[in-house]
Amino acid sequence: MNVILCSSNMLKGLYDISGVEVGQHLYWQIGGFQVHAQVLITSWVVIAILLGSVTVAVRNPQTIPTNGQNFFEYVLEFIRDLSKTQIGEEYGPWVPFIGTMFLFIFVSNWSGALLPWKLIELPHGELAAPTNDINTTVALALPTSVAYFYAGLTKKGLGYFGKYIQPTPILLPINILEDFTKPLSLSFRLFGNILADELVVVVLVSLVPLVVPIPVMFLGLFTSGIQALIFATLAAAYIGESMEGHH
């Protein structure tokens, strides 16, 4: 009973995280919900960039790929290799999910450094990378949790829950908490790194000449790409773990 109560509190805490705010926000009222307008605007921009670039690159696919098509085929091959390494031979159905997570996070992270969001003035707050907001990272982490539960239940049925008493039933509470802390770690890791990177650049730009922060900005681009890779790798690893039943 205590384990169930603790798990319930963990889920409630994860939901409450969406109320965390850093700075001012512009709010939109959609139905009965109040949403952060900055996150929606920048997320739509990122999605438009992804859809537009893919459409332009592969609208006339060639047998021998060139330019944009060649680039996206390389990206697809990279994501397939990543999924196969972490999930195993049954990786195929999960490539679109892992690829979507990786590309959205990667472009979102880079948009914070490369796009001139600050030039767009809002009544309240300012635009920034979508992953700069905890709501976005939680929204990315929760489907990942659903995905690895779904993968395990689809592969093993109710026998999937047997992993919680392995290697001994004494570890039942810890094994349950482990699954509920995975989305927490995914969301906070991504949010914290992207927010910290943008704050460091803003502080340096305000304190020293423009040329000095440039190396830090390049480092930020590198770490932003690494964060996207880490998120996608962990998501694939969790799915593979739930299907194999080992840690």
Swiss-Prot record:
Key component of the proton channel; it plays a direct role in the translocation of protons across the membrane. Keywords: ATP synthesis, CF(0), Chloroplast, Hydrogen ion transport, Ion transport, Membrane, Plastid, Thylakoid, Transmembrane, Transmembrane helix, Transport. This is ATP synthase subunit a, chloroplastic. The keyword Membrane applies. The chain crosses the membrane at residues 38-58, 95-115, 134-154, 199-219, 220-240. It comes from Acorus calamus. The keyword Chloroplast applies. It is found in: Plastid, Chloroplast thylakoid membrane. Belongs to the ATPase A chain family. HAMAP family: ATP_synth_a_bact (MF_01393). The gene is atpI.
